[in-house]
Amino acid sequence: MLPLIDGKEVKRRWSGRLLAREGVAARVREIIAAVKREGQAAVERYTLELDGVDLKEAGFRVTREEIGAAYRAVSPDLLEALRIARDNIATYHRRQPRGSWMETAADGTILGQICRPLGRVGLYVPGGTAAYPSSVLMTAVPARVAGVREIALATPPRRDGTLPPLLLVAAAEAGVEEIYKMGGAQAVAALAYGTEKVAPVDKIAGPGNIYVTLAKKEVYGQVDIDMLAGPSEIVVIADGKARPDWVAADLLSQAEHDALAGAVLITPDAGLARAVGEEVTRQLEALPRREIASRSLADYGAAVVVTGLDAAMDLANSLAPEHLELYVSEPWSWLGRVENAGAIFLGPYSSEPLGDYLAGPSHVLPTGGTARFYSPLSVDTFLKKSSLIACNRAGFRAAAGYIQALARAEGLEGHARAIELREE
């Protein structure tokens, strides 16, 4: 069930899963254009067509009564787990630097940077084959820590027009009260351009399917976006001392997300590769989402046997995975070799689901090789920065000649004269 292939084949398969069909992109553009043109009517029409929900009957914005009912439906144990996760996420993100600064030079010139939170953001939380209250916390809590004033959350409704109670409770626990029953490209367009019932946002963050990702790409420039996140993925680097059943379980934890998810073991130990493959087959039998996981592993899963851990690190860096587990004897000694990864998990007890739910860092991470240049969602995702320049007369005179020389070298006489006038 876990194909034994080489690194080149893994890279070929992983790149192929991210190629969007033009038909999907065209459909996304069609939906966005309709929402821009028709507003709320288009959102409601596509929700009926694609999700099978009549928002006129189900209600578009979640009410206080719905949130109250959700609390009554959630067990005390689950509520406690949500609150522990929320607090861990908040604690982690409060440690992230976000301060403004100013410095005064010897000539009196003041330079600085002013950091401010975005005024209004839209968060997308996926639905479909599973509900993700954890994604609510992983996006909303960092936004709250950053100081965002208004947060609008969009998530697709279930067939009966409701949202999962645990998702609603997670939103309430994160301080989000503006929740809309909409998903897909129509939700992204509504957040970006606004409708009669949704005020436009400054930025859209959160993971979604190919329609959501392409829609975010289309509206970028009208609003900012966090990243273009694709299917989930994990790379486990393990040596011969790793437990095959633990490695297999971690691979399956990502494979069960989506048929397009990628799960790869890289090891210098051929015996471990075989044992993990056998464990994957055994554990699949008891997995409720085994059909999804089986398709994922058949198409985008792999065990790759390499010559040593150095070669394993090279392959992992070229894949730039969303999640990278270092399940080796001395993981800290290999940390410095990691160049590209969204999140890094060190040692046998740092199982990937720890990051998905409770540790503290956001689980919204770069995928599809974009960890080469994207960073995880964080407080910084929800901040904007302004440069500050305050020059006095002495500082101006010291700089004036250089500015005029550079401006005239670029053929921008107006720039030079703006400086020259102040010297007179």
Curated annotation (Swiss-Prot):
Pfam families membership: Histidinol_dh (PF00815)
Catalytic activity: L-histidinol + 2 NAD(+) + H2O = L-histidine + 2 NADH + 3 H(+)
Cofactor: Zn(2+)
Top-level EC class: oxidoreductase
Keywords: Amino-acid biosynthesis, Histidine biosynthesis, Metal-binding, NAD, Oxidoreductase, Zinc
Sequence positions that bind substrate: 232, 254, 257, 323, 356, 410, 415
Binding positions for Zn(2+) per the UniProt entry: 254, 257, 356, 415
An MF annotation (GO) of this entry: histidinol dehydrogenase activity
Residues bound to NAD(+): 124, 186, 209
Record-listed E.C. numbers: 1.1.1.23
Organism superkingdom: Bacteria
CDD domains registered for this protein in UniProt: Histidinol_dh (cd06572)
Gene3D superfamilies (alphabetical): 1.20.5.1300, Nitrogenase molybdenum iron protein domain
Phosphoprotein listed as a keyword: no
Pathway info: Amino-acid biosynthesis; L-histidine biosynthesis; L-histidine from 5-phospho-alpha-D-ribose 1-diphosphate: step 9/9
Cofactor annotation remark: Binds 1 zinc ion per subunit.
The keyword Zinc is annotated on this UniProt entry: yes
Active site positions: 322-323
GO biological process: L-histidine biosynthetic process
Family: Belongs to the histidinol dehydrogenase family.
Function according to Swiss-Prot or TrEMBL: Catalyzes the sequential NAD-dependent oxidations of L-histidinol to L-histidinaldehyde and then to L-histidine.
Classification via HAMAP family: HisD (MF_01024)
Protein name as it appears in the record: Histidinol dehydrogenase
Lineage, top ranks: Bacteria, Bacillati, Bacillota, Clostridia, Moorellales
Gene, per the UniProt record: hisD
